Structures are given as structure tokens and as C-alpha cells.
């Protein structure tokens, strides 16, 4: 049985798509090993079928500290790969992949890199010259070296299986000013559970890097929104830290808004299928999931994201009329409230965005697996 190594770490945005790819490759008869770092250890579940290896590389701004750490990590990775004898190594970008990718190059193991964002990251750009193929999610990608263009294959991003099981069902008029809306129902469900036809549900989450800003901005925006449209029936599903939830619950209760909170949503499919609109960061995996199911979103890019890639992701979607980008440095509770009210009051805008999202959907788990099989 041929062995394939996947390398991803740092955040859930890198981790979960790589796991989804691993599951597809296992179905095709490969033995899949996954090298990740300590930060992603929390995401490992017993029912995941890939074989995990923890290889941590701590970041440091001091080159004299980082180089010895990198050297040790590379030696460990060389030993690991030498014993495995993989047919290919696939890296998803970010500094946690550096040591395993160097090890693969040293051992002459073919490498493939996958860039999830619309901006080629520093690590992927460095390894581009060594890669057999470069898989990308967006047809338009910034920061791509001229020499790498011949290696490019557009595969789209990889979406988790439980999200892929969702399908879009056209619903008739829901009775609110929102008119016809889309309800996301699990493919295996035969009966649509009844819900309040007038209820507009907003799903708010900040990803694995946290949502502290949202715990302050969103409640303030909802207060303004309800002042402008008191008859609006809202349901809020929101990621929030425990110490923020009491304060937010008090605000929503006074506004007569139904709500659901969690520090982290383990099964996003359950929340996606209830939502009419998402407010989130603009990480690549989030965008791929929303694209796959045609769920429109207001994106507030994380300013500290490497190379400002979240801004480029969100701006590209806005240019394609598939989402809306509000920069954190320029946003206010009033601006966000106005945008939400505009979308609720003009359902055609939401519906068009949903259709545009579905047009750019790709079966990334299959396309990337096909590419890997070509290289092996």
C-alpha cells in the first residue's frame, strides 16, 4: 500500500481541510500519515482515520534561536519520512510544514503544495520551486512567481465531509421582507423540520483564532439594527468566550432575540443549515465551506493574518458579488447594522450571492486527490 504524507498545522483552517483530503485518499486505498504541530493536537479525534504524528516547531523572531530549532525538527522529520518511505508529501502552507518539506526534498520525495488563499503565502512561495505541482483554490492568485505558473492546477479548497453532505434546497416565500430564502438541509434528511418562517438567522463565528471583537461589535450592531427595525424577528447563533456570553445574553434577551452560544462549534453543519447569513473572518476554509453550500457572508478579515491574505480573500469575493468585505479598521456597529438591514430588506441580493457562490464551487477533495495520484 502506497503511503502519502499530509502536512498542516497552526490553525483549524489548515488542519480540517487536510484531514478531509486524507479521508478521501484512504477511500482510494492509500495509507495516509498526517504531520501536524502541538497547536492542532486539540483537533485530533479518535474517529479520524489518518495516522497522526506531532512534530512541533516553535516560532521565534530571533534567527539564532529559530535555526537550531529548525535543524532539530528537520532531522526528526528526515527520520520519520525515511522510515515511512512515502510516495508523495503534500503541504498546506504555514511555518509548521517547513521541517517536513525540507525532509521530503532531502529524501527526494515528490512534494505538492496547496495554497488555500488568494495570496500565495511566504512558505508556499519558498517551496514552489521544489514542488511538482501547486494546487490553488482561486483562479486568480496574487504573489505567484512567473516560473511557478506552469505548475498551477486549480483544484479549489477541500471541504469537510459533513459539510459536503449539506445540500441547497430552494424554499418558497418565508413571509418576511426577506422573501424567498435558502434552507440548508442534510442530504440524508427526508423531512424539513418546521421553523418560524419569519425568523432570520445570523450565524457569527471568528474561527479558531478567536472572536473577541465579535463579542463587542455584534451585540452593539444588533441593538442599532433592532432600533431601526423593531418588528424584525432575529435568531443569533454566535461563537463567544464564556466570560462574554453572560453580557451578550443580557443584551439579546432585552431585545427579545432568540440565541445560541458556544465557545467552539464542533459540527458547523448544524449551524450552517439554520443560517440565512454568516458574519465571520475570511479564512480560506471558511470561505470554501460557505461556497460549497451557497451561504452568503459578511466578512471581517483578520488584520493580523499573514500577508493580509484574509483581506485579499474577502475582497475577491466582493468583486465577484459573492460576499461583502468590511475591514476591521474601518468598521463600526452602525456600518455593520446598516449592511445587515440592507441584506435583510433586499433578499434578491442574498439570493444572487448564493447562486454566484454555487457557480464557483469545486469538488476540491476529488480534484486534489486526482492530482496527487498523477504525481505518484
Curated annotation (Swiss-Prot):
InterPro entries: GlcNAc_MurG, Glyco_trans_28_C, GlycoTrans_28_N, RPE4. Its main location: membrane. Pathway: Cell wall biogenesis; peptidoglycan biosynthesis. It is found in: Cell inner membrane. GO terms for cellular component: plasma membrane. UDP-N-acetyl-alpha-D-glucosamine binds at residues 11-13, 117, 160, 208, 310. Disulfide bonds: none annotated. It comes from the Bacteria. One of its GO terms (biological process) is cell division. It holds the Pfam family Glyco_tran_28_C. It is a peripheral membrane protein. Its EC number is 2.4.1.227. Keywords: Cell cycle, Cell division, Cell inner membrane, Cell membrane, Cell shape, Cell wall biogenesis/degradation, Glycosyltransferase, Membrane, Peptidoglycan synthesis, Transferase. It is an enzyme of class 2 (transferase). One of its GO terms (molecular function) is UDP-N-acetyl-D-glucosamine:N-acetylmuramoyl-L-alanyl-D-glutamyl-meso-2,6-diaminopimelyl-D-alanyl-D-alanine-diphosphoundecaprenol 4-beta-N-acetylglucosaminlytransferase activity. It catalyses: di-trans,octa-cis-undecaprenyl diphospho-N-acetyl-alpha-D-muramoyl-L-alanyl-D-glutamyl-meso-2,6-diaminopimeloyl-D-alanyl-D-alanine + UDP-N-acetyl-alpha-D-glucosamine = di-trans,octa-cis-undecaprenyl diphospho-[N-acetyl-alpha-D-glucosaminyl-(1->4)]-N-acetyl-alpha-D-muramoyl-L-alanyl-D-glutamyl-meso-2,6-diaminopimeloyl-D-alanyl-D-alanine + UDP + H(+). Gene3D superfamilies: Glycogen Phosphorylase B (3.40.50.2000). Cell wall formation. Catalyzes the transfer of a GlcNAc subunit on undecaprenyl-pyrophosphoryl-MurNAc-pentapeptide (lipid intermediate I) to form undecaprenyl-pyrophosphoryl-MurNAc-(pentapeptide)GlcNAc (lipid intermediate II). Belongs to the glycosyltransferase 28 family. MurG subfamily. NCBIfam families: murG, RPE4. This is UDP-N-acetylglucosamine--N-acetylmuramyl-(pentapeptide) pyrophosphoryl-undecaprenol N-acetylglucosamine transferase. It comes from Rickettsia peacockii (strain Rustic). The gene is murG.
